[in-house]
Amino acid sequence: MASRGINKVILVGNLGNDPEIRYMPSGGAVANITVATSETWRDKATGEPREKTEWHRVTLYGKLAEVAGEYLRKGSQVYIEGQLQTRKWQDQNGQDRYSTEVVVQGYNGIMQMLGGRQQQGGAPAMGGAPQQQQGGWGQPQQPAAQPSYQKQAPAQQQPMQSQPQYNEPPMDFDDDIPF
């Protein structure tokens, strides 16, 4: 299938509100979230720090929507990969309106929770965030312990490795001792 372009959005930001969860007549879950991304800079004229925040509408479908509803809260930090879509709808007066949002669904959609576990109320849990090991000789190289939820085609799934990968230099025991 020929592609005529790429439509991919990547966001890392914080939720502005708790997720809104609904269910379609077919039973599939839909979650609506707003994600804030900010950039900061120093004003050249005044030297004062400046900040600009953008708010992004994100819609998640299926299992990702259920996970968002259960685990995400206002202030949660998330990594989102999806596609930009514009939809047309009519308001109460019959006027056509348009909404552009990031849609996370199917095999290309990713939602990863960042920032550790959350307690009730959205505050980070004390000691709840796993400590990531520093890489060194003889220590296993483990991926970050944050849960990642991504839909994948069953044929593309790879078997899980049961043994951790060790970052050790190769040992050559056939060498003579140099003294």
Curated annotation (Swiss-Prot):
InterPro entries: NA-bd_OB-fold, Primosome_PriB/ssb, ssDNA-bd
Gene3D superfamilies: Nucleic acid-binding proteins
GO CC, alphabetical: nucleoid
Domain SSB: 6-111
A Pfam family assignment: SSB
CDD domains: SSB_OBF
Residue ranges, compositional bias (Low complexity): 117-165
Keyword Ligase: no
UniProt region (Disordered), positions on chain: 117-179
SUPFAM superfamilies recorded: Nucleic acid-binding proteins
Keywords: DNA damage, DNA recombination, DNA repair, DNA replication, DNA-binding
Any one GO biological process: DNA replication
UniProt short sequence motif Important for interaction with partner proteins, positions renumbered to this chain: 174-179
Function: Plays an important role in DNA replication, recombination and repair. Binds to ssDNA and to an array of partner proteins to recruit them to their sites of action during DNA metabolism.
Subunit description: Homotetramer.
Protein name: Single-stranded DNA-binding protein
Organism whose genome encodes this protein: Vibrio vulnificus (strain CMCP6)
GN (gene name): ssb
